[in-house]
Amino acid sequence: MSAKDIEHRQVIVIGAGPAGSAAAQRLAEEGIDVLVLERRSIVGNPAQCGECIPHWGEVIGTFKHLEDHAWLKEYFDFPERLILHRLDNMRVFLPSGKSYHFELDAFAGHRLQFDGFLADKAERAGAEIRMSTSLKRLQQQRKANRELLVTSEGRFTCDYLIDASGSLAHVGRLRHGQDKDVRPEDQVPTIYAQVKGDVPETFDVFLGSVAPSGYAWIIPKGPEFANVGLGVRAGKLEGDLKGHLERFCADLNLEIISFGGGWIPMGG
């Protein structure tokens, strides 16, 4: 192993999703050398969420202590081309049939374009993003007292490492294995479908038997299209997740165009 084959950077970020790109942009704006490693060939593809994105007003309405962070506010200045449908209202339906209505300051967006937009901002700020580069393992260099990152496209060291790989915490798993103290096991699998049909104007959430120990959602993306999905804790659902979603969409007379999915961490 030659030291010449190892590339050193100040900060390496694993994952070019919204968190990774935002962190990279902020660091680059401060003049810090930052490299983002993304395992996929296209940022944001495939999408792994319901595609509801909050505006700044919704963020500070929920997290009031963030209001004075002007630099953070800039991250929520989105161009109109990312906004497919404005979400001004939300409804939550309980198993009893009772519902609650809330005002909302958000929009339905296209995650592929949204993630690409954030990655472009990070690169314009001076960050470097390398695609199709997956982290394979971490090796401790005892003499140098640092970790060696072994990837599909080379080896790296860094002063600081940021794990922005998503809810399954790829870096944490490589470093700590199945240690429950650093990797909670309670991960909720989710599945969604892009659908066509008579969809509501509001962002609707359903609790109860439709998604045991979880929730289902309908996020309208325009007059006839929506992102419909559900997340259920493992072991709480009879049958497979995809079949359950198909029945949910059939009950709503919605035509399924495509499927996607992801994970939601519970408890940490």
Show the residue positions of the predicted features.
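N-terminal FAD cofactor-binding segment of flavoenzymes
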Residues: R40-M90
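Short beta-strand to alpha-helix junction loop
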Residues: H101-K121, H170, R233-L241
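Hydrophobic anchor at the start of a short beta-strand
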Residues: V11, I32-V34, L161, F203
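Predominantly flavin-linked oxidoreductase catalytic cores and closely associated redox partners
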Residues: A16, E123-E255
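Flavin (FAD/FMN) cofactor-binding core of flavoprotein oxidoreductases
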Residues: E255-G268
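Conserved Rossmann-like nucleotide-cofactor binding loop
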Residues: A19, I42, L168
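Glycine-rich FAD pyrophosphate-binding loop
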Residues: A16, A28-C49
